Amino acid sequence: MSDPEIALALVGFGNVGRRFLRLLDEAADRLDFRWRLVAISTRRHGNVVDPAGIDPARAIRTVEAGGSLAGRDTTRQERSGIDVIRQVTESLADEAADGQLVVIETTVLDIDDGEPATAHVRASLEGQAHVVTTNKAPVAFAYDDLEGLAETVDRVFFFEGAVMDGVPVFNLVRETMPAVFVDGFRGVLNTTCQYILSQMERGVSLDAAIADMQARGITEADPSLDIDGWDAAAKTAALVNVLMGGAITPHDVTRSGIRDMDETEVRDALTHGRRIRLIASATRHGGRLETRVEPELIDASDPLATLGPTENALYLHTDLLGDIGIVQRSSSLTQTAYAILSDLTQISRRLREL
């Protein structure tokens, strides 16, 4: 059987989206599918749709040079992501019907209501496209609705890159833990806060630690979502919704960040053999879920206390296997891009089985 060809439409074309296209090229001899790029939708660089195929390298060069993908066609410049999704699902209706169209959603998290990412996923599924996203919002705000829609239209909604980059959290449970009940979890899920707290243990102020990360290009210009605990809350909601059958949003998570922490108290904890970490957790009490993101003072013997400045970890509490630990030693664009590739490979295998 020849390798299936998958048409790819990218909604969002920032660092992750561009790294993903480069990864496809770098891993070409390891892929079990063929692909062509048929659409790109961006917020700042316009949009382009071409069912015959778009040159990925040229698109990357254009965006990184600050140019517009739309060229001189201002109508393409002004269209929304939803408009592009609808155009591509209509113009490639035959491929969508055959399950060979995939929309890859990599826009940034909007913590208020999860839009427009959630609408992007919904419109893609309604157009019979499979969806892969690295955005936490659709999973954290509308997982049940979107997963139900995916089942109705016989398409997949994958999101391995939404939590811990490319580390296979969701695939681990879905593919290798049949009949196992996840009744809670606890982890360090935000690299920015982990790095800042590690620096504060050395006497560096929060503001100086943030400035250092920004200078290194490893945090956003505005790190509020990280230091106020919203990023970890969105990841907590996503994990609860998928692994524990919850139906919550990030706003349901009891949350406090590290904005008001002082380097003195962080150093004092270390002096007394303890450490402060931003911990995300979920526990089930009968029929009630308790979810939290907050700085915790933990003993040096706690596995989460041993994590380095750029390390994350998640411990799943299960009924049959006890506690299962997943540790991420570092995070990078390549790992997030790999999560998309991993999900695409799952879709390719599905096509081979048809």
Where are these regions (language model features)?
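Conserved active-site and cofactor/substrate-binding residues in soluble primary-metabolism enzymes
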Residues: V11, N15, R19, W35, ...
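N-terminal glycine-/serine-/threonine-rich beta1-alpha1-beta2 phosphate-ribose binding loop
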Residues: M1-E126
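Substrate-binding/catalytic subdomain of NAD(P)-dependent oxidoreductase enzymes
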Residues: Q199, I210-T306
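Hydrophobic beta-strand scaffold residues
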Residues: V131, F157-F158, E220, I276
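General beta-strand structural signal in soluble alpha/beta enzymes
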Residues: I40, V102-E105, V132-T134, F157-G161, ...
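Catalytic, metal-anchored helix/loop core of enzyme active sites in primary metabolism
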Residues: G184-R186, D212, I218-P223, S281-T283, ...
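Rossmann-like NAD(P)H-binding beta-loop-alpha module
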Residues: E151-T219, W230
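Rossmann-fold NAD(P)-binding glycine/threonine-rich loop
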Residues: V108-G127, T134-D165, F170-V173
